[in-house]
Design a protein with these regions (language model features):
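Conserved C-terminal helix/tail region of periplasmic/extracytoplasmic solute-binding proteins
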Residues: 312-346
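Pocket-lining segment of extracytoplasmic ligand-binding domains
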Residues: 184-277
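N-terminal secretory signal peptides that target proteins for export/translocation
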Residues: 1-5
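Signal peptide processing junction and immediate N-terminal pro/mature segment
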Residues: 20-30
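Short, glycine-/small- and polar/acidic-enriched structural segments
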Residues: 29-170, 176-179, 195-201, 217
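Short, solvent-exposed loop/beta-turn-alpha elements that line the ligand-binding surface or hinge
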Residues: 63, 116-120, 221-223, 297-304
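Bacterial N-terminal signal peptides
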Residues: 9-21
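Secondary-structure end/capping motifs
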Residues: 240-322
Length: 346
């Protein structure tokens, strides 16, 4: 066999090809943004904000060239005005009539990703019944005439209770709704002031541990679709004027939700993830975080449109929403598509 010496021209061609590859668009995509972009991000401190808090603490936003400042809101109604006025560029939000009304009125916002779903294995929302009523309430029809505590008629968990009432052939007017905060619901179950409640974790676990209620039905047990309980919204100005930053934000956020899902399904860094949640959410007891049903997330960030439309139907039926919002005009998946192209589809 004859070996030929490698010529200088061959080496030069190889070197130039390597340089061209290093400067390719794919390589440039993953370099941090320069200059860095500052983003104000709204959150209320719910466990469903897990992807946000994990991305912040693990440096995923920083890796993308983003300087993210968390802005804390005490209640969901504060979020939409903050997005509309530009106080924050990105925020999580509950699914409410106010959200749909804002979309219907054309307020500058985009619906861009999932932020919390009720699905099989992720039953963080449930209908609970007082412990002493378990023999009396066995079927959906047995909900007629009962007094239920809800966070409000205009929230997704109450719309999901509405689906349970439908299964029992019950109109909303045939039950009594009492609006209470989640901690107050547990107390009301204990003193028998209510018959049942729509609870979220960790209050489901707390109520059952105190034996004041039983988990009657998880929302995932009867909904004909995955329940969409939270969403991510971008201000339209941010999305249009800082499009590259909007894409990079989504990469970091989706990495955060993946880290959460890996922790709760496979135990990957479970203690570390729980420690992050304990620092940022109302659930400060790490041992409680280990026991509660986890929040669900679509691993590719997609929204459950059927759930959002069902919520709209409920809000319109109760006169809580002014007009139907055309979701096809406000949902924008280009940022998720970019993130999935970077991280891979799950």
């Amino acid at each position: 066999m004859t070996f030929r010496p490698i010529t200088t021209s061959f080496v030069m061609c190889f070197f130039l090809a390597a340089l061209a590859n290093a400067a390719s668009p794919a390589a440039a995509q993953t370099a941090p943004l320069n200059p860095r972009v500052a983003i104000k991000l709204g959150a209320i401190g719910a466990v469903s904000d897990a992807g946000i808090f994990i991305a912040q603490e693990k440096g995923y936003f920083t890796d993308e060239g983003l300087d993210v400042e968390l802005v804390s809101f005490k209640a969901a109604p504060q979020i939409l005005p903050a997005i509309a006025t530009g106080e924050v560029q990105v925020s999580g939000s509950a699914v409410t009539p106010a959200l749909f009304n804002a979309f219907a009125r054309g307020i500058g916002m985009k619906l861009v990703a999932d932020k919390g779903q009720v699905a099989k294995g992720f039953g963080f929302a449930a209908i609970v019944i007082r412990s002493d009523l378990t023999d009396a309430v066995k079927d959906f029809k047995d909900l007629r005439g009962r007094k239920f505590a809800v966070m409000g008629k205009g929230v997704s968990s109450t719309a999901q209770l509405g689906k349970a009432l439908e299964l029992g052939g019950i109109e909303p007017s045939e039950v009594e709704f009492v609006e209470l905060g989640l901690p107050e619901m547990v107390a009301a179950l204990g003193n028998k002031a209510i018959d049942g409640a729509t609870l979220l974790e960790p209050f489901i676990t707390l109520a059952t541990a105190r034996n004041v209620a039983v988990r009657w039905k998880g929302m995932e047990d009867f909904l004909p679709f995955t329940g969409q309980n939270g969403v991510i919204i971008y201000s339209q100005k941010f999305a249009e004027e800082q499009g590259e930053a909007a894409k990079r934000w989504m990469v970091a956020y989706l990495k955060g939700t993946h880290a959460y899902l890996d922790a709760v399904t496979s135990g990957v860094d479970r203690d570390g993830i729980n420690a992050i949640l304990a620092r940022h959410t109302a659930v400060k007891d790490v041992s409680l975080l280990r026991r509660i049903a986890p929040t669900g997330f679509d691993p590719n960030g997609r929204l459950e449109i059927k759930s959002l439309e069902a919520d709209q139907d409920w809000f319109l039926k109760l006169g809580l929403q002014q007009g139907h919002a055309d979701l096809s005009r406000v949902i924008d998946y280009q940022y998720l598509d970019y993130a999935v192209s970077r991280l891979g589809k799950r």
